[in-house]
């Protein structure tokens, strides 16, 4: 019998705008490759760049927050698996799933650890060393509680698995490592990519409403790019990303060669003709979609430690990893001007992609894991007493707050 997956999205997937959107489409592809029927629901309004899920024959449902209409929808759909797109969605809808579809497997797709990103942001603002006092923040309490309430959480980075196990003491049986899932890079694809002599300029990519990307943009503009431009006056910095605001567009300066290009429909078409990708992230979490795009297109990178986290495992990076602005600029210049270095780093990227992110390495095992837990879901939950406790206590407050808002809204209308 065909199994039914309900994905509740924080937003409608935008694979051309963000790594989160690409990740969601990869999950959808994984489920469909094993013949799961998919319903995608979201309380968010669709944006212009949202992917047309009709093309994949996916049922789409607009849902309301704090509304009993979701309960009726859930009971009628009766899904086998419910995937929550980030912990905020689980907070809103998780208790309703537990109440009306208690046998459904609850899966949290963390995207990245929001609490880790927030802690690093706070430490950066304080100009302090990141430690437990920053990691154990208000977001942590919410996100870790959400992980416990779910049967399985998908973690995109091995580094984050270790943080959850060692810092938060989350049991490993609640966590599943599932990185970006990409096609392999064949010899034919490598051969067709533009060579170094056919490429020019530097590139940076990132959704501008994502706080780490905006901070990286300012760091690049004011502390790194002037050092590069001084040595390479003919080179330009091309910055691409969705949702460029006025404050972003004001950073455009043709005289300095710093160009805000904005949204691009196909990042591959600009990435493969760029010579070097720069990723000067100072805080953040998860895996960086911009580095995946760069490696897929054979574009070497200069990146910070934060950007490189979880990307390379035991393999050589597709570029240089440096945090100091002057050293970052020096390595960018070196990579831009040295063909031997450039070719070597490009090859590293191909090796990393095929060894660490080829979807064929992960999808079958992931589906087996889901099926195994779902088949023995009661036994699995008995090993998660903390989750049962949070389900009983924390969710009661969430549930009754939601019902109070629901009642309040009904009185208004």
Model-found features: residue ranges?
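Acidic donor-binding loop of glycosyltransferase active sites
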Residues: 79, 272-286, 299
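A short, active-site helix/loop in glycosyltransferases that binds the activated sugar's phosphate group
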Residues: 92-93, 140-172, 248
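Conserved acidic donor-binding segment of nucleotide-sugar-dependent glycosyltransferases
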Residues: 318-326, 334-339
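C-terminal amphipathic helix plus adjacent low-complexity
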Residues: 348-413
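Acceptor-binding helix/loop patch of EC 2.4 sugar-transfer enzymes
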Residues: 14, 103-104, 108-137, 197, ...
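Conserved catalytic-core segment of nucleotide-activated headgroup transferases in glycan assembly
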Residues: 40, 166-170, 175-268, 272
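Short hydrophobic beta-strand element within catalytic cores of glycosyltransferases
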Residues: 290-293, 300-304
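N-terminal subdomain of nucleotide-sugar transferases
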Residues: 1-50
């Amino acid at each position: 019998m065909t199994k039914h997956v309900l994905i509740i999205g924080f937003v409608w997937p935008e694979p051309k705008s963000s790594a989160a959107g690409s990740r969601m489409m990869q999950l959808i592809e994984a489920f469909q490759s094993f013949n799961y029927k998919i319903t995608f629901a979201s309380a968010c309004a669709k944006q212009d760049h949202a992917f047309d899920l009709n093309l994949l024959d996916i049922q789409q449902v607009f849902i309301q927050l704090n509304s009993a209409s979701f309960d009726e929808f859930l009971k009628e759909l009766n899904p086998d698996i419910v995937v929550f797109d980030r912990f905020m969605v689980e907070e809103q809808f998780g208790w309703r799933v537990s109440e009306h579809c208690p046998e459904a497997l609850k899966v949290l797709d963390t995207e990245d650890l929001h609490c880790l990103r927030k802690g690093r942001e706070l430490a950066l603002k304080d100009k302090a060393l990141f430690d437990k006092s920053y990691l154990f923040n208000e977001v942590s309490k919410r996100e870790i509680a959400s992980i416990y309430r779910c049967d399985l959480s998908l973690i995109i980075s091995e580094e984050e698995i270790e943080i959850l196990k060692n810092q938060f003491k989350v049991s490993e049986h609640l966590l599943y490592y599932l990185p970006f899932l990409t096609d392999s890079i064949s010899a034919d694809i490598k051969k067709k990519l533009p060579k170094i002599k056919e490429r020019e300029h530097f590139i940076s990519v990132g959704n501008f409403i994502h706080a780490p990307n905006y901070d990286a943009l300012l760091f690049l503009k004011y502390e790194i790019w002037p050092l590069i431009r001084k040595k390479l006056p003919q080179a330009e910095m091309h910055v691409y990303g969705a949702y460029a605001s006025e404050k972003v567009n004001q950073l455009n300066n043709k005289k300095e060669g710093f160009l805000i290009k904005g949204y691009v429909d196909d990042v591959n078409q600009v990435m493969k003709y760029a010579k070097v990708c720069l990723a000067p992230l100072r805080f953040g979490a998860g895996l960086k979609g911009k580095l995946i795009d760069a490696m897929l297109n054979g574009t070497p990178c200069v990146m910070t430690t934060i950007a490189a986290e979880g990307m390379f495992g035991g393999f050589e990076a597709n570029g240089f990893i440096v945090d100091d602005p002057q050293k970052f600029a020096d390595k960018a210049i070196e990579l831009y001007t040295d063909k031997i270095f450039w070719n070597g780093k490009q090859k590293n990227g191909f090796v990393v992609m095929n060894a660490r992110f080829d979807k064929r390495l992960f999808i079958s095992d992931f589906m087996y894991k889901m099926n195994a837990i779902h088949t023995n879901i009661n036994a699995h939950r008995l090993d998660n007493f903390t989750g049962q406790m949070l389900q009983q206590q924390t969710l009661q407050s969430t549930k009754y707050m939601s019902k109070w808002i629901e009642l309040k809204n009904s009185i208004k209308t």
